[in-house]
Amino acid sequence: MELNEQYIEQHILSALKEDVGEGDYSSLACIPSTERGKAKLVAKQACVVCGMDIACKVFELTDKDIVFTPLMKDGQNAEKGDVLFRVEGSAASILTAERTALNYMQRLSGIASTTAEYVNLIKGTSTRLLDTRKTTPCMRLLEKYAVKTGGGINHRIGLYDMIMLKDNHIDFAGGIENAIDKTLHYLKENHLELKIEIEVRDLDELRRVLAHGGVNRIMLDNFSVEDTRKAVELIAQRYETESSGGITAENILSYARCGVDYISVGALTHHIKSIDLSLLTDE
């Protein structure tokens, strides 16, 4: 995923407006406008770096005269104590931009690092790791960028780029067959070319989908490892397969060994810890 420059700029401007408001009175009150300073961002724990260009843009939009020097790139592994970037310029401006820049980098690096951990757990299998739509409001593109930076694959971005027939869709539509037929009719009538994924809750629902057809991918929702193995055998590579629900770091390899094409993990974006990064004055 490539982040649009205009999107990033507007996102950062909103974040700065939220934080700075009418002014950074703490800095304005005690630091002369002529005071210059240097600072460095230090990793206080190992991580996968993510958000470097965004941090650079935060400082640029705060004060175009700040000199930002990146020392690592997104996707690189940082060790505890590594310096990720240096900045030089107005001391007050550096302090004004500090928290917004760190908020982006700490969260995005946390997502990238968590994703990398999960990807490493299923290394050696053919299964690929997907994210979900369980993202922070207005942060989805950034968080999905972080997932990709960590080695994961982006699932659909929103409700508009893929059909996902979940349990509630099926129930409201009057069953699996009705949901599929209505969807196929809608896509044809509106000249839309979208892939269809359908969620099944047990092996009986899976058999109904297999008998009916008309989809591209089948999501095995909250299946046990044993039932996942049976499901993969029943599907026999006729459709893409995805395991979802209840997948953790402890059991993800067991699911991957069942032979599913994808495993989606909501925790990549909604249950992560931000990375501990600290901006320190530099000599």
Task: Indicate residue ranges for each PLM-predicted region.
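Cys/His-rich Zn2+-binding cysteine-cluster or related metal-binding knuckle/ribbon modules and their
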Residues: A249
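Acidic/glycine-rich phosphate/pyrophosphate-binding loops and surrounding catalytic core
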Residues: E2-H212, R217, E226-L234, Y239-E242, ...
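Short secondary-structure boundary segments
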Residues: D221-N222, G245, A267-L268
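Short, charged, intrinsically disordered terminal tails
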Residues: A267-E283
